Curated annotation (Swiss-Prot):
Compartments in which it is found: Cytoplasm
Keywords for the protein's UniProt record, in alphabetical order: ATP-binding, Cytoplasm, Kinase, Nucleotide-binding, Transferase
EC number: 2.7.4.25
Gene Ontology terms: biological process: nucleobase-containing small molecule interconversion; pyrimidine nucleotide metabolic process
Binding site for ATP: 12-20
Pfam family name, one: Cytidylate_kin
Protein source organism: Aeromonas salmonicida (strain A449)
Superkingdom to which the source organism belongs: Bacteria
InterPro entries named in the record: Cytidylate_kin (IPR003136), Cytidylate_kinase_dom (IPR011994), P-loop_NTPase (IPR027417)
Catalysed reactions, semicolon-separated: CMP + ATP = CDP + ADP; dCMP + ATP = dCDP + ADP
Similarity field: Belongs to the cytidylate kinase family. Type 1 subfamily.
Protein name: Cytidylate kinase
Primary site of residence: cytoplasm
One of the record's GO cellular component terms: cytosol
């Protein structure tokens, strides 16, 4: 039986720095990238493009199973490509976000997307960014990281990010939203946000991104070496 491509899962709460870390890892290692958080938005956009009814689970399942999506890494950003078109900005619209929330409620759609996500596991390897990558999607991943940071630090990062883009934002409101989202994510019935038992927990609160990257790469080298030796 041929050996499967290695997977590194990066899970954690919103604002912990997963996206930046995954982009750097994919660039450094030359591995494929899966942004699971974008998958439902991409499916929603595909449904809108193809006039598929958002309340028809039966119509959405085959669309999910055959979703033509790629995540392309370059030095500036991760491009989300649907059917050959860069949709990185389009999937962030409110219309697509609302549609994504609606279709995510269908169990058979979730199951189809689970299989689609697992199909990203190709040589030379996969960096999987999400919230349940190491616990649900790739429980057999060779390297599992849970990237965390205090709610205050994550709110501060988001505050600076939005300010730099010219938005007028309230820090206390951001902090409240992050705490509420954490509570929802950690206590939901299906795939709650939690570190896999065999994950390395990295608290990035007082670390630079370079320090986080170095820590993860050193751990990955150790784990992948152990996996190839066993």
């Amino acid at each position: 039986m041929p050996q499967m491509a290695p997977v590194m899962t990066i899970d954690g709460p919103s604002g912990a720095g997963k996206g930046t870390l995954c982009q750097l890892l994919a660039e450094k290692l030359g591995w494929h990238l899966l942004d699971s958080g974008a998958i439902y938005r991409v499916l929603a956009l595909a449904a809108l493009h193809h006039d598929v009814e958002l309340d028809s689970e039966a119509a959405l399942v085959p669309l999910a199973a055959n979703l033509d999506v790629q995540f392309q890494v370059d030095s500036e950003q991760v491009k989300v490509v649907l059917e050959g078109e860069d949709v990185s900005r389009t999937i962030r619209t409110e219309e697509v976000g609302n549609a994504a929330s609606k279709i995510a409620a269908f169990p058979r759609v979730r199951e189809a997307l689970l299989r689609r996500q697992r199909a990203f596991r190709q040589t030379p390897g996969l960096i999987a960014d999400g919230r349940d990558m190491g616990t649900v999607v790739f429980p057999d991943a060779e390297v599992k990281i849970f990237l965390d940071a205090s709610a205050e630090e994550r709110a501060q990062r988001r505050y600076k990010q939005l300010q730099d883009k010219g938005f007028d934002v309230n820090f206390e409101r951001l902090l409240t939203e992050i705490r509420e989202r954490d509570d929802r994510d950690r206590n939901r019935a299906v795939a709650p946000l939690k570190a896999a038992e065999d994950a390395l927990v990295v608290d990035s609160t007082s670390m630079t991104i370079d320090e986080v990257l170095a820590t993860v790469l050193a751990y990955a080298e150790q784990q992948l070496g152990d996996a190839s030796a066993s």
